[in-house]
Amino acid sequence: MAGRGGRVLLALCAALVAGGWLLAAEAQEPGAPAAGMRRRRRLQQEDGISFEYHRYPELREALVSVWLQCTAISRIYTVGRSFEGRELLVIELSDNPGVHEPGEPEFKYIGNMHGNEAVGRELLIFLAQYLCNEYQRGNETIVNLIHSTRIHIMPSLNPDGFEKAASQPGELKDWFVGRSNAQGIDLNRNFPDLDRIVYVNEKEGGPNNHLLKNLKKIVDQNSKLAPETKAVIHWIMDIPFVLSANLHGGDLVANYPYDETRSGTAHEYSSCPDDAIFQSLARAYSSFNPVMSDPNRPPCRKNDDDSSFVDGTTNGGAWYSVPGGMQDFNYLSSNCFEITVELSCEKFPPEETLKSYWEDNKNSLINYLEQIHRGVKGFVRDLQGNPIANATISVDGIDHDVTSAKDGDYWRLLVPGNYKLTASAPGYLAITKKVAVPFSPAVGVDFELESFSERKEEEKEELMEWWKMMSETLNF
């Protein structure tokens, strides 16, 4: 009885804290809608999903609503603040929220990087509510995902830009108003241009991954980086993300690396070493969206060049070159593979169309999330069973390595096939293993590395044994 009372009190306290947080947010937010507007929105909900645009206070309210409904599998946190002080909110869904469980991969969705591209923002709010609802209903797919994956959802990377775009009168919004952050910075051109570094390294030799290793301080000191950009860079570097998607608007296509062309031309297919798996990941999204994958779909605009589009996917450089983009930054600075998904021809479509966008994208969002459980996964440990962090996992024939996380766990996304994987770490002898990879689930391959000191001791013992044997044989 006391335990039940304690749980009720805890829930009540949580609700009061959340309510106070929301009231404070609305009091300080000049664009907050009136109470009557909020009541109207609640009347238009289905399964807790309000198919309407959420201004900043309403976004917070929607995330808190999910958290209060599914406290056991969710938490809300912030990675930083926008230039105007709005929080960059994330809702996490996991069977152990707030904790990296060894062997469990980390996934992220990011929306609304361009503030006037609003569909992704709303879809991610809807997705959080949907995952909560379906988990409580016992949906096997969703339950398995939440029990085996740590899912991070950031509905808006550019809340300042969204507020500017949403403040325009009428349904027809300007194509560019609110695209940039409050400083006028295009966030998807604001990341360190690691493509240029890796293109030089391809020719002259050099690292093929983690090109910002140990350079967090330099990022903080770079005055050209927006606060939103810096916050996401730290997020990417601090959590061992495996897979990600960045949701945009203005077209209908799933875009994969590289985004920036090698030659500097405007259009050129720019494959990365993991071109095969990236093509497969992009198709995993587009193929479940009936509009995006329709081969007879006309271009969004009369003069659009969609010649690079195949099955609703495109290589970024083949479409148009983007220097300083977040997608390639993920791939070249961390273990995270990210694609960019363009969700709608209109950037800020009428509110009444949001439900149809959800219906078109719901299965794609879930199917793409499931792709994190492909390829190879495992642990790198020493002979005593201690985890080895930052061990390098190399795949023969693919010039892009990944590294193990702090618990020695690693994940390597791959298409089906036969591979040779090598695990190595400073001070240890490398080990190579052969592995046959199916489509899914991921194959478990663990590595136990012997240190050089252990090998020397072993060789010394072998030499002593040999000397003893020779002494006995020759009667020394």
Swiss-Prot record:
The keyword Membrane applies. Its EC number is 3.4.17.10. Residues 52-372 form the Peptidase M14 domain. The keyword Coiled coil does not apply. It is found in: Cytoplasmic vesicle, Secretory vesicle; Cytoplasmic vesicle, Secretory vesicle membrane; Secreted. GO terms for cellular component: dendrite; dense core granule; extracellular region; extracellular space; Golgi apparatus; neuronal cell body; nucleus; perikaryon. Residues 28-42 form a propeptide. GO terms for biological process: cardiac left ventricle morphogenesis; cellular response to dexamethasone stimulus; cellular response to hydrogen peroxide; cellular response to staurosporine; enkephalin processing; insulin processing; insulin secretion involved in cellular response to glucose stimulus; negative regulation of branching morphogenesis of a nerve. The active site is at E342 (proton donor/acceptor). GO terms for molecular function: carboxypeptidase activity; cell adhesion molecule binding; cobalt ion binding; metallocarboxypeptidase activity; neurexin family protein binding; protein domain specific binding; zinc ion binding. It is a peripheral membrane protein. Zn(2+) binds at H114, E117, H248. Binds 1 zinc ion per subunit. InterPro entries: CarboxyPept-like_regulatory (IPR008969), M14_CPE_CPD (IPR034232), Peptidase_M14 (IPR000834), Peptidase_M14_domain (IPR050753). Expressed in brain, heart and anterior pituitary gland. Also expressed in pancreatic islets and adrenal gland. Belongs to the peptidase M14 family. Interacts with secretogranin III/SCG3. This is Carboxypeptidase E. It comes from Rattus norvegicus.
